[in-house]
């Protein structure tokens, strides 16, 4: 008997040996040992408390910034659903958003409530949970600029309230989330009052800019590499000659050369292999290290 045969009782759903490709924007990747779809926060907390400590736990949002390797993922993959996607104004320029709420929905609801400052989320793929993990942002704004506090569970199911400072944010990183496995439940944000029409106009500009410059309708995971200090990743990839080059079924987009795309039949190995080839070439030609922004998980 293995740990999979003695999983804790839950009110949500447990899926065994389920392919993860349909759960990611790249549409690649092997199966998870177990996928857990919790009914609510209490269901999730109880499950984590009862799950043997040696079982790995991975949280997967909408899979926008994640590359699941072809061998699949050990342990339990947690996928948060509608119960974790609530978005509601809290008064005084504040807004609560669940970890499963899409970033673009958070931007929209903030705008409708006359809360400015969260417009940048219109241009960020994925969910608030992922944004909290990596201090997601774009166009000169990022999560730490608007976060008041975040709510999370530890691997042991303990509830935490974490201030902005507690999370130790820097460029595309939370020191706290990097040091300790956290399952984010939601967060409280604070903006400033503004006219909803003016906010919507700014978000429309962001949408137009994205559609013109990014391959948002392709099978992609968003920005592939972080920008190194003093450099733009897209420019380094472009100048190294990788824009539009095929590697198996993988390619760096002709529209934006920091966007890795699945042209249709790519494997996770194709996508990661192309990324690593580009990293090596950029290092050799320019002496600059490109660090992955896309999270790569699982067995090769």
Curated annotation (Swiss-Prot):
Query: Which pathway is this protein assigned to?
Result: Cell wall biogenesis; peptidoglycan biosynthesis
The record's listing under InterPro entries reads: FAD-bd_PCMH, FAD-bd_PCMH-like_sf, FAD-bd_PCMH_sub1, FAD-bd_PCMH_sub2, MurB, MurB_C, MurB_C_sf, Oxid_FAD_bind_N
- Keywords per UniProt: Cell cycle, Cell division, Cell shape, Cell wall biogenesis/degradation, Cytoplasm, FAD, Flavoprotein, NADP, Oxidoreductase, Peptidoglycan synthesis
Pfam entry (one): MurB_C
GO terms, biological process = cell division; cell wall organization; peptidoglycan biosynthetic process; regulation of cell shape
The record's subcellular locations are: Cytoplasm
Q: Where is the active site?
A: 172, 223, 293
The chemistry this enzyme catalyses reads: UDP-N-acetyl-alpha-D-muramate + NADP(+) = UDP-N-acetyl-3-O-(1-carboxyvinyl)-alpha-D-glucosamine + NADPH + H(+)
Where is it predominantly found?
cytoplasm
Among the entry's GO cellular component annotations, what is one?
A: cytosol
The coenzyme or cofactor needed here is: FAD
This entry's Gene Ontology molecular function terms read:
FAD binding; UDP-N-acetylmuramate dehydrogenase activity
Q: Which Gene3D superfamilies match?
A: 3.30.465.10, UDP-N-acetylenolpyruvoylglucosamine reductase, C-terminal domain (3.90.78.10), Uridine Diphospho-n-acetylenolpyruvylglucosamine Reductase, domain 2 (3.30.43.10)
Give residue ranges for domain FAD-binding PCMH-type.
27-216
Enzyme Commission code(s) on record: 1.3.1.98
Which family does the UniProt entry place this protein in?
Belongs to the MurB family.
Protein role: Cell wall formation.
Protein name according to UniProt:
UDP-N-acetylenolpyruvoylglucosamine reductase
Q: Which organism is it from?
A: Phenylobacterium zucineum (strain HLK1)
């Amino acid at each position: 008997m293995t740990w999979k045969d003695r999983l804790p009782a839950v009110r949500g759903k447990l899926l065994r040996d389920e392919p993860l490709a349909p759960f990611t924007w790249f549409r690649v990747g092997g199966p998870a040992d177990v996928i857990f779809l919790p009914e609510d926060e209490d269901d999730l907390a109880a499950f984590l408390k009862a799950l043997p400590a040696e079982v790995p736990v991975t949280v997967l949002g909408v899979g926008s910034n994640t590359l699941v390797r072809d061998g699949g993922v050990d342990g339990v993959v947690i996928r948060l659903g509608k119960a974790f996607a609530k978005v509601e104004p809290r008064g005084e320029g504040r807004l609560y958003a669940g970890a499963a709420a899409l970033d673009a929905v958070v931007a929209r609801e903030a705008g409708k409530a006359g809360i400015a400052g969260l417009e940048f989320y219109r241009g960020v793929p994925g969910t608030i949970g992922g944004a909290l993990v990596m201090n997601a942002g774009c166009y000169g704004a990022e999560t730490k600029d608007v976060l008041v506090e975040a709510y999370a569970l530890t691997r042991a199911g303990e509830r935490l309230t974490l201030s902005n400072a507690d999370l130790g944010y820097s460029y595309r990183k939370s020191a706290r989330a990097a040091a300790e496995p956290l399952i984010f439940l939601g967060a409280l944000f604070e903006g400033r009052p503004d006219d909803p029409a003016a906010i919507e106009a700014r978000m429309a500009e962001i949408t137009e800019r994205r559609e013109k410059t990014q391959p948002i309708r392709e099978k992609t995971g968003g920005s592939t590499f972080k920008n190194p200090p003093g450099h733009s990743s897209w420019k380094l990839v472009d100048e190294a000659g990788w824009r539009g080059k095929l590697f198996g079924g993988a390619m760096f987009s002709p529209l934006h050369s920091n966007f890795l795309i699945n042209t249709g039949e790519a494997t996770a190995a194709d996508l990661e292999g192309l990324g690593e080839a580009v990293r090596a070439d950029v290092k050799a030609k320019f002496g600059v290290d490109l660090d992955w922004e896309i999270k790569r998980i699982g067995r090769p």
